[in-house]
Swiss-Prot record:
InterPro entries registered for this protein in UniProt: F-box-like_dom_sf, FBX25/32
One GO BP annotation of this record: protein ubiquitination
Subcellular localization, as worded in the UniProt entry: Cytoplasm; Nucleus
Keywords tagged on the record: Cytoplasm, Disease variant, Nucleus, Ubl conjugation pathway
Signal peptide range: none
Ranges of residues in domain F-box: 223-271
Short motif Nuclear localization signal, span: 62-67
Pathway info: Protein modification; protein ubiquitination
Superkingdom classification of source: Eukaryota
Motif (Bipartite nuclear localization signal): 280-295
GO cellular component: cytoplasm; cytosol; nucleoplasm; nucleus; SCF ubiquitin ligase complex; Z disc
Record's subunit section: Part of the SCF (SKP1-CUL1-F-box) E3 ubiquitin-protein ligase complex SCF(FBXO32) formed of CUL1, SKP1, RBX1 and FBXO32.
Organism: Homo sapiens (Human)
Name assigned to this protein: F-box only protein 32
Length: 355
């Protein structure tokens, strides 16, 4: 009777015992045997070559299909949890460490840009990454970075808000990429050089779209900003944290120009962003012998960083070392999780992953 070989190297074919020893059973219906061992070996080699070529073809086809899908997709890699555990070293329970790219993929920045409280925070974070941390991201994180940036540009084109902020972000990114592309071959960027050249052309196209944007007047015919009392207008202008916004607002109407030159307004703006010591080092007098707070502000901006304030920020739980957005639930074992959370500025977020 036929015997099935148990050798793990056997291809699983049948063997029968004859007077001359064990021989391979070729065709059960005809009952013929393989007597010529060389012919069998040649056939086996032929079958293996066909199998190998078939596998190579399947793998290549799957890879082309995967690359095509990856090149067309515009969505961020999605994770169900909106938090990430930040660990900087290996332990018995957890090996490896958390990287900036991993945190960037997990914290759902695509949804965060739709929230007006988080928009400026995300844009500032994108700017810091574009300046110095782009090479720290993995290939997937770099792709997510460009996808999120595209969503930011589309949102600005639709809402017609924060145009100058995104212009500066795109210019910063383009300048960084010009430097990094010239160093190709030194493992500074992940991906093909042609892909990064295409991305740079896309950035130039976005810049052109932002430069050509036309602000449309709303159809609303009700009360406008200039119809408000002067004291209320001045109170609203004091809420602006960027001096360039005050200058732009003053160019909108002659009455607003007078308010935008108010010395007390610029004095409070200087005191908000800079310390008394910094202000004393950059005193500027006007022709009338008074402090020119407007000129002092723009000089201080060139010398010192401005104070950053955001409506919503990322928070780090000191108890469980979990990073998440404010108001996002995370598995914390502390009795009072809110007291353990510390707000992180965009720069603090970057520094968190410097080892």
């Amino acid at each position: 009777m036929p015997f099935l070989g148990q050798d793990w190297r056997s291809p699983g074919q049948n063997w029968v015992k004859t007077a001359d020893g064990w021989k391979r059973f070729l065709d059960e219906k005809s009952g013929s045997f393989v007597s010529d061992l060389s012919s069998y070996c040649n056939k086996e080699v032929y079958n293996k070559e066909n199998l190998f070529n078939s596998l190579n073809y399947d793998v290549a086809a799957k890879k082309r299909k995967k690359d095509m899908l990856n090149s067309k997709t515009k969505t961020q890699y999605f994770h169900q949890e909106k938090w990430i555990y930040v660990h900087k070293g290996s332990t018995k329970e957890r090996h490896g460490y958390c990287t900036l790219g991993e945190a960037f993929n997990r914290l759902d920045f695509s949804t965060a840009i739709l929230d007006s409280r988080r928009f400026n925070y995300v844009v500032r974070l994108l700017e810091l990454i574009a300046k110095s941390q782009l090479t720290s991201l993995s290939g997937i994180a770099q792709k997510n970075f460009m996808n999120i940036l595209e969503k930011v540009v589309l949102k600005v084109l639709e809402d017609q808000q924060n145009i100058r902020l995104i212009r500066e972000l795109l210019q910063t990114l383009y300048t960084s990429l010009c430097t990094l592309v010239q160093r190709v071959g030194k493992s500074v960027l992940v991906g093909n050089i042609n892909m990064w050249v295409y991305r740079m052309e896309t950035i130039l196209h976005w810049q052109q779209q932002l430069n050509n944007i036309q602000i449309t007047r709303p159809a609303f015919k009700g009360l406008t900003f200039t119809d408000l009392p002067l004291c209320l207008q001045l109170n609203i202008m004091q809420r602006l944290s960027d001096g360039r916004d005050l200058v732009s607002l003053g160019q909108a109407a002659p009455d607003l120009h007078v308010l935008s030159e108010d010395r007390l307004l610029w004095k409070k703006l200087c005191q908000y962003h800079f310390s008394e010591r910094q202000i004393r080092k950059r005193l500027i007098l006007s022709d009338k012998g008074q402090l020119d707070w407007k000129k002092m502000y723009f000089k201080l901006v060139r010398c010192y960083p401005r104070k950053e304030q955001y409506g919503d920020t990322l928070q780090l739980c000191k108890h469980c070392h979990i990073l998440s957005w404010k108001g996002t639930d995370h598995p914390c074992t502390a009795n009072n999780p809110e007291s353990c959370s510390v707000s992180l500025s965009p720069q603090d977020f970057i520094n968190l992953f410097k080892f």
